[in-house]
Amino acid sequence: MNQSAEIICVGTELLLGEILNSNAQFLAQQLAQLGIPHYYQTVVGDNPVRLKKAVAIACERSRLLIFTGGLGPTPDDLTTETLADFFDLPLVEHPEILADITRKYAHRGRTITANNRKQALLPLGAAILPNPTGTAPGMIWHPRPSLTVLTFPGVPSEMQCMWQETAIPYLRAQGWGQEMIYSQVLRFWGIAESALAERVAPFLELASPTVAPYASHGEARLRISVRAANETEALEQIQPIATQIHQLTGLDCYGSDEDSLASVLGKLLHSRQETLSVAESCTGGGLGQMLTAIPGSSAYFWGGVISYDNQVKISLLGVDPDTLTRVGAVSAAVAEQMALGVRSRLETTWGLSITGIAGPGGGTETKPVGLVYIGLAGPAGVEHYECRFSDFRGRDWIRHLSACTALDYLRRKLLTLG
């Protein structure tokens, strides 16, 4: 039998696509980091017959079975009793679970009902996997020799807490994942995944650390991964590769791991003691939202104007009506005047603007959907950048790319200034 893990997510709502299966994504990432092999994922509806079939298949090919969902008090929550039935072991009530559920309900000003008692039932021999934030406990169980079963509730926040606090220490103590996989993700903007892969081609051939390109949310990324006994050992192998890639890719690499364009730009502005204001048209506040999502951004981001209507561009930003008549709102000239206007009105170091056609309508042969102008006004004057985004992924995609590109445009400007 393979020394591998398998993820089985239970819930008809997952099969119907009503809920995103974020639990499987989280667990897959966690298993990879722990160095635990993982080759299969299964989604099963709230049906005991089909769940038993999935368990039978999993038992033939995996040693660690991880279940999410089906631990609640309602009739369609069948994971625990189905597993007990499959392995032909009785359910046993745990008074400590019932007491914990009663206490949590009382804290919320509620009393438990009869169906809550089923959450206190676990198969004979199973240990409680505590749920600090919810009422549905999981279990750690060895129903057969060399087989480990872990169950978690389907609520992602509860499952993740239980995994971090109890499951990981348990698995490590049992000898799972003695060598973990450590990774660093380098993040790029303004370069396609294919172009990035070509530029760093020699690194993609490395056996250890491995370097793999992928794309996410419009940006290209490189994951540098290595199997190591500890983080210090891993960094000693990863960092030289990351440094070489940084040198090779220059300004296209904007950060790593949890960095975002907004957070990186914020650090630059804060270190320079400079401030920013924004004027937005087609992004409708999306640029400001990205900036204010960063804690402490009020130190450098002073505010913005959503000038969706031309009259707002004129009255609040000082855009010339003749310019609007002559070249239209989606133009380099208007983008520059918007940036100048918001910088002057809010008295900031930099003014950043966006005007464009996000679609799906409104495009013409000369100004198609996806045409966007970014304006940037600063101490030395004003400039603009023209973007032509593909519209095949729709309006929200164009708005997202526009806001990110504006952040990147100012980031590159600041780094060029030194």
Curated annotation (Swiss-Prot):
Coiled coil: none annotated. InterPro entries: CinA (IPR050101), CinA-like_C (IPR036653), CinA_C (IPR008136), CinA_KH (IPR041424), Competence-induced_CinA (IPR008135), MoaB/Mog-like_dom_sf (IPR036425), MoaB/Mog_dom (IPR001453). SUPFAM superfamilies: CinA-like, Molybdenum cofactor biosynthesis proteins. Pfam families: CinA (PF02464), CinA_KH (PF18146), MoCF_biosynth (PF00994). CDD domains: cinA. Belongs to the CinA family. This is CinA-like protein. It comes from Cyanothece sp. (strain PCC 7425 / ATCC 29141).
